[in-house]
């Protein structure tokens, strides 16, 4: 029976490359000359530091652009509020890994409401979709792509 998995993951290598590119771009920007600003990557968390709140938003925009260039979907970013400490502003950005249980229930509900002849099963932080033929699975993929669930999804482990 054909099946595939729906997952929501961020490629850590591409994330590191995007942060490195953003750091390089930061070094060449004229408006950041002589400014104490930086990106720091720890696991799936990025800590941004700048001297001004406006510069912090500029750094987030630089990071979003570099993430897009590297193929990392910006919807997986969870931007926290800016914190002012001393003369610097700090902001944490987390990246969502895995599908939240509430979102996975919404996905299952949406797929079942579409009357496509597939079965959806929640398996931890991923979803397994099984069906009788490939066309039904591709219809389920289209439903997931069209829906706005607030995070990006990848389709893996496609079996015939």
Swiss-Prot record:
Q: Quote the CDD domains the UniProt record gives.
A: YajQ_like
Q: Which InterPro entries match?
A: DUF520 (IPR007551), UPF0234-like_C (IPR035571), UPF0234_N (IPR035570), YajQ-like_sf (IPR036183)
Q: Which GO terms describe its cellular component?
A: cytosol
Asked if Nucleotide-binding is a keyword of the record, the answer is yes
Q: Which UniProt keywords apply?
A: Nucleotide-binding
Gene3D superfamilies, A to Z: 3.30.70.860, YajQ-like, domain 2
GO MF term list: nucleotide binding
Keyword Signal assigned: no
Q: Which Pfam families match?
A: DUF520
Q: Which family does it belong to?
A: Belongs to the YajQ family.
The record, for NCBIfam families, names:
PRK05412.1
Query: What does the UniProt function comment say about this protein?
Result: Nucleotide-binding protein.
**PANTHER family named among the record's database cross-references:** UPF0234 PROTEIN YAJQ
Q: What is this protein called?
A: Nucleotide-binding protein VSAL_I1728
Q: Which organism is it from?
A: Aliivibrio salmonicida (strain LFI1238)
State the organism's lineage: Bacteria, Pseudomonadati, Pseudomonadota, Gammaproteobacteria, Vibrionales
């Amino acid at each position: 029976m054909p099946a595939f998995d729906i997952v929501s993951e961020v490629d850590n290598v591409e994330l590191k490359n995007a942060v490195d590119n953003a750091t390089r771009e930061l070094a060449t920007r004229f408006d950041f000359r002589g400014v104490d600003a930086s990106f720091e990557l720890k696991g799936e968390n990025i800590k941004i530091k700048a001297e001004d709140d406006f510069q912090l938003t500029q750094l987030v925009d630089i990071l979003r652009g570099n993430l897009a260039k590297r193929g990392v979907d910006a919807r997986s970013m969870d931007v926290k509020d800016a914190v002012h400490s001393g003369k610097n502003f700090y902001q944490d950005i987390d990246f969502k890994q895995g599908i939240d249980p509430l979102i996975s229930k919404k996905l299952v509900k949406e797929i079942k409401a579409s009357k496509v002849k597939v079965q959806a099963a929640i398996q931890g932080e991923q979803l397994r979709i099984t069906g009788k033929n490939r066309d039904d699975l591709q219809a389920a993929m289209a439903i997931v792509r069209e829906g706005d669930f607030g995070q990006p999804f990848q389709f893996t482990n496609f079996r015939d």
